[in-house]
From Swiss-Prot:
Pfam families: DUF2462
Region (Disordered): 1-32
Basic residues composition bias: residue spans: 19-31
GO cellular component: nucleolus; nucleus
Annotated protein name in UniProt: UPF0390 protein C24B10.18
Xref: InterPro entries: UPF0390
Species name: Schizosaccharomyces pombe (strain 972 / ATCC 24843)
Amino acid sequence: MAQGEFKKKKNSSANKGGRVTKHSKNPKKGARYCAPRRAAAIKDHTINANITKTLNVRNEKLIAGIASQQVGKLTITKALGEAGAKELKEGKH
């Protein structure tokens, strides 16, 4: 009885247009790597950047208030530190 060939597995999600990430260690035998499309990668980066920007703005006064209580940990402007400390005392965060 003749032995059949072992064909490489095709990634069904890649064939349907889905994105597949590269396995850094020990990929499955016959696994295929499909690079993400450039437009999708740029879109993801933009979304992540916008989220980070929003979080930074939201937490700026809180971080400054904590820093003003822990003298010497961070260098911040006096006005921003006082505003943050005031909000901490009032319990806005």
